[in-house]
Amino acid sequence: MNCRAAERKDDTVENEQMLEQKKLDEFLQVINENLKELREKKKEVDQENKELYDAYMEGDVELYSSLMVSSTMQDHVNHSITANESALEKTHFGRIDYLDQEKGEQYRLYIGKHGITKNATDIVIMDWRAAAASIYYEGTTGECSYRTPQGKMIPIRLDLKRTFDIDGPVLKGFYDSDTAANDELLIKYLAKNKDVVLGEIVATIQQEQNTIIRERPNRSMIIQGVAGSGKTTVAVHRISYILYNFSDRYDPSEICIIGSNDILLNYIASGLPSLDVYNTKQYRMEKLFEYLIGAYLPKKYEIIPTLVQESSELRLKSSLAFVQTIERWTRDEESRIIPTEEVRDKSYTFLSQESIDQYCRYFDDRSVVSKMENLNTRLAAAIKLEMDGEDANVRKEMLKKYKKHFSKNYKKRSLVQLYLDFLFSLEEHLANTTENANATEDANENSTNTNIMSSTTWSEWKKRVKKGFFDCYDLAAMALLAHGWLDEGDDDEFAQMYIDEAQDYGVAVYYVIKKRMPKTAFMIMGDVSQNINYDSGMNDWEELRQIMLPDSKDPSNEGLRGRFYTLCKSYRNTIEISNFAAQILDRSSFKTYPIEPIVRHGSPVGIWKENDETAMTMRVQALIEQLKKEDYKTIALICRDEDEAARLKSLTNCVSDTGNEAVDCTTDSVTDGAIADTSADIIAGITVTVLPLALTKGLEFDAVILYNPNEECYADSDRDAKLLYVAVTRALHELHIVYTGELCKLLSDCPTQP
């Protein structure tokens, strides 16, 4: 009986396989028909667009609107072709059968990376971003529900959730279950190289990731995610989800992505078009502040890295106390500059003290200059009203007398001079403070002992500013000063902002961003265990939560309440690499978050001790050749800093090409992310890349070789524990460590190759 039951089950599976293969064939036929029609449409639209453009350029300006409509149609057709071509490679990845309990109707939906329609109206494959598709990611068989973009909950009974393994026109298999099938497919994908994994992420989005992706669009969030937990993946898919479901509320140009370096930003941007996301804005953090300050910056200036500053200076100007002190100084200066006494002349009272105070309180968020100008305007209006019956010349003289009443004490200063004046004031205040430690009376414990700076450090800081050399924190401070002194209002250009590797910046920058963009919804992602800027970055999230997330206790603010999420599952590394990384964190004293690696085994971590630099170079070359033979497409050589990366590149000779890729056998085949622009090479995944550790943030590689982490390079400290944790968690499949001398203590006890 058991044998017969097994036979019947096998027959059922085989029949289902045939039926699903037939459905796949039908989908492919629809897609090919779509492509045929779209390519014909493209010829027509391209020709029309060319004719309109030529006529417009010849002077027919009335055709401008028609040209814009035609260009929009051209973009739409091109995007549709791209989506259908992508669907040819993998039409769909999931299927759900469910009963809508409100309508009493049964549905069977196939879900893919791109929505595919037949005859332009009939949906044959549902886009993964559609509301009902969330059932696939979160629903379990039986009674459940899904939320529409408008917030309505739809009760359903889920009868089947099926996951497909498809390769072009071939259905290789399918799995029916709740989460096991999704996990099984995920593990299978993770075993592939990096390029393959990136192309198949939508098929393996996990429940906790899906919850974040489909959060309300106006909700701000902080995401603490361990290395490899998919923080960046969640962000780009959330952008795609929002633009798909709320296209009437959000334009791509209103979405801004912030990253710590151009390599990371290019890596993120490269994945957006495949998710139907175009024309978003991307900035490094310092470039964002440069953009916000705009014309208030001097004609000649240079943005410098924070690494050139003293640690005491960095600790001060990256702190919350520092930017809050800027605001207090601005208010104190405003009180000194703007007269608040009643404006009275002879028998006329133009403005009472109460009305002036009331105005300043009501428009507290306006800049000093804006308040002065508006008060002068109000005073002029009051004079005209009160002296309406007076002789015109008398009234004119009175207006002239009080024309600059509220700005008479104001000395016009450049933004740089305002910043210098503040720094002089702060230095004097700290020098006169008994403990010479706190920038403010209510400075918290974390800022204690961070503000003690020598006179030399103060002098060097002010000299740099005066010469026009600004780091990210100088720019943040000046952005806050511009907002408090010069700007006309808040910045409302960006409705959504996504900040990756957030822990690398101090809370000061977030305080300024929030002040300048109070209406923006933020998604802030990071891992405090990966803070590579120990003196200035964040080692916990508490201050940031207070700044960026609205009060969660206010029930009337449900739609805007901020959320803090933790992602503990690591999908990037093998068990062996994850355990190795966890041992590094175990030796540290800072707060860490638990890592839950997906069960995927690989090779043990390789530890290679060599006698000298020449032997290390030979070992690196041998490892590169070995890794290429294993068909790894992305291999990173990670060094402590840029100098070591440049030196390693000069020493490393190209190994012979053993794959199908055409690589010139010169040292140029080993690229240098510190000196040359190699972001395209990294994204394409066809080269061995030499990188300083700081530039690896947010990236991942099939294999990593960590170069010379000996006791001379890395101390047994929390600072270096975070650096090494970042380095080793870049590897998807293999990690090798090559060194001379004594291996640093942070790595010496980690589980390695026997």
Question: What residue ranges belong to the model's regions?
Answer:
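Short glycine/proline-rich turn/loop motifs
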Residues: 183-190, 460-461, 561-563
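Alpha-helical nucleic-acid-binding subdomain
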Residues: 243-498, 503-512, 520-521, 539, ...
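Extended, charged low-complexity regulatory segments
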Residues: 1-202, 206, 210-214, 439, ...
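Conserved helicase motor core of SF1/SF2 NTP-dependent helicases
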Residues: 253, 262, 266-278, 283-290, ...
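Acidic, Ala/Val/Gly-enriched low-complexity intrinsically disordered segments
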Residues: 5, 437-443, 662-663, 670, ...
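Short, hydrophobic/proline-enriched secondary-structure or compact coil segments at domain edges
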Residues: 92-98, 473-482, 638
